[in-house]
């Protein structure tokens, strides 16, 4: 697995000083554009849940839709998009969540997950954890059981993984990058 993980890390483009000076943006579009790396990433994201009954995969906008859809397909689970407010056409449930520099809102269709269903969160990256914590709270608000969260990238210096684990969510990541 170590070789696979180093190959995945090498397939992620790092862009310095984007979107702000001092930030290194981790761009997974290069991973997504490489069929072998994309397949390996999805296989590795799915691996901890093989043989586990998972009702739904919840993907966070926007790259979580790509990865989450692939994970849902592999696990024969349904897929639930968690979107920024105002983007879904039917009856929704919404929650405000904290960002590094403010507050935003996310929503999902109220009927997308039934109480008691087992759900895994999927996104490309966990940094401060604001979005993932908000998504966890949103899913729990409607009675879902969040049984895990998986991300291609973890930025451990920003503490997001720890915040999710403090909520009792088991976190699975593939690649760690230090710094911001």
Swiss-Prot record:
Pathway of action: Purine metabolism; AMP biosynthesis via salvage pathway; AMP from adenine: step 1/1
Keywords for the protein's UniProt record, in alphabetical order: Cytoplasm, Glycosyltransferase, Purine salvage, Transferase
Superkingdom: Bacteria
Keyword Transferase among UniProt keywords: yes
Catalysed reactions, semicolon-separated: AMP + diphosphate = 5-phospho-alpha-D-ribose 1-diphosphate + adenine
A Gene Ontology cellular-component term: cytoplasm
GO molecular function: adenine binding; adenine phosphoribosyltransferase activity; AMP binding
EC number(s) reported in the record: 2.4.2.7
UniProt-annotated location(s): Cytoplasm
First-tier enzyme category under EC: transferase
Location, primary (coarse class): cytoplasm
Pfam families (alphabetical): Pribosyltran
Assembly and oligomerization: Homodimer.
Family, per entry: Belongs to the purine/pyrimidine phosphoribosyltransferase family.
Main function: Catalyzes a salvage reaction resulting in the formation of AMP, that is energically less costly than de novo synthesis.
Name assigned to this protein: Adenine phosphoribosyltransferase 1
Gene: apt1
């Amino acid at each position: 697995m170590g070789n696979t993980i180093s190959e995945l890390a090498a397939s992620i483009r790092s862009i310095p000083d984007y979107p702000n000076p001092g930030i290194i943006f981790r761009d997974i579009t290069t991973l997504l554009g490489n069929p072998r790396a994309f397949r390996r990433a999805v296989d590795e994201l799915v691996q901890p849940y093989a043989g586990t009954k998972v009702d739904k995969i919840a993907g966070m906008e926007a790259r979580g839709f790509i990865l989450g859809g692939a994970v849902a397909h592999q696990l024969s689970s349904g897929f639930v998009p968690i979107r920024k407010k105002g983007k879904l056409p039917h009856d929704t449930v919404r929650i405000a969540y904290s960002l590094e520099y403010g507050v935003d809102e996310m929503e999902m269709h109220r009927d997308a997950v039934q109480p008691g269903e087992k759900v895994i969160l999927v996104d490309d990256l966990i940094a401060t954890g604001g979005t993932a914590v908000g998504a966890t709270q949103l899913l729990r608000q409607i009675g879902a059981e969040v049984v895990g969260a998986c991300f291609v990238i973890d930025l451990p210096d920003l503490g997001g993984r720890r915040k999710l684990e403090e909520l009792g969510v088991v976190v699975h990541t593939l690649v760690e990058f230090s710094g911001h």
